[in-house]
């Protein structure tokens, strides 16, 4: 979402279950509408109200990192909400959409567009060169501060139940996000849309 205002005059609705992350988001983007609820259910109930939808369903049960630690973590089914949202948007949503997630430890059930360490499912073309070499040096000692500095976000006042390193690592590269929105907006502009409502 960061830097999207540079692309177009947009109205954004952000949906986040974590109340304290929602607070941080609202402080950063006071003009956005922030809803504290389950994004998966909200998508089903409100998808038709938007022109563009970006969804990033929870990734831990899909990630290669978790599977690599399978000797020390409990087994868990992959969360199929990811594929529910892809199929739902593909068949029901009339606007442009992006569903983003990490590379899984298995062959994806629905072929994605692979860009760097992320997979994207979209109904429009996205740039091929979204990998940002700056982000490859973030992990390790002091990674939270490096991610936060790159994304210009402050997690120091976060008091919720998630680990800050997990939050920082889950931030989608804002440069990639902006370029994807530019791609969608360019296509939508050609379709004579004057203003976007974004989810």
Ranges and model annotations:
Residues 1-44, 54:
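SAM cofactor-binding core of SAM-dependent methyltransferases
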Residues 42-52, 59-199:
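Class I S-adenosyl-L-methionine
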């Amino acid at each position: 979402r960061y830097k999207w205002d540079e692309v177009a005059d947009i109205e954004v609705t952000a949906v986040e279950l974590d109340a304290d992350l929602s607070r941080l988001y609202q402080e950063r983007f006071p003009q956005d509408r922030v809803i504290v609820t389950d994004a998966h259910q909200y998508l089903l109930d409100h998808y038709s109200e938007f022109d563009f939808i970006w969804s990033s369903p929870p990734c831990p049960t899909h990630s290669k990192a978790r599977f690599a630690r399978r000797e020390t973590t409990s087994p868990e089914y992959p969360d199929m909400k990811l594929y529910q949202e892809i199929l739902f948007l593909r068949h029901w949503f009339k606007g442009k959409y992006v569903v983003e997630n990490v590379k899984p430890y298995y062959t994806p059930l629905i072929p994605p567009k692979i860009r760097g360490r992320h997979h994207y499912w979209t109904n429009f073309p996205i740039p091929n060169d979204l990998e940002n070499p700056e982000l490859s040096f973030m992990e390790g000692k002091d990674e939270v501060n490096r991610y936060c500095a790159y994304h210009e976000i402050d997690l120091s006042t976060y008091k919720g139940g998630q680990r800050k390193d997990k939050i920082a690592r889950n931030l989608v590269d804002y440069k990639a996000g902006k370029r994807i929105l530019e791609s969608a907006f360019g296509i939508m502009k050609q379709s004579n849309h004057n203003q976007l409502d974004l989810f």
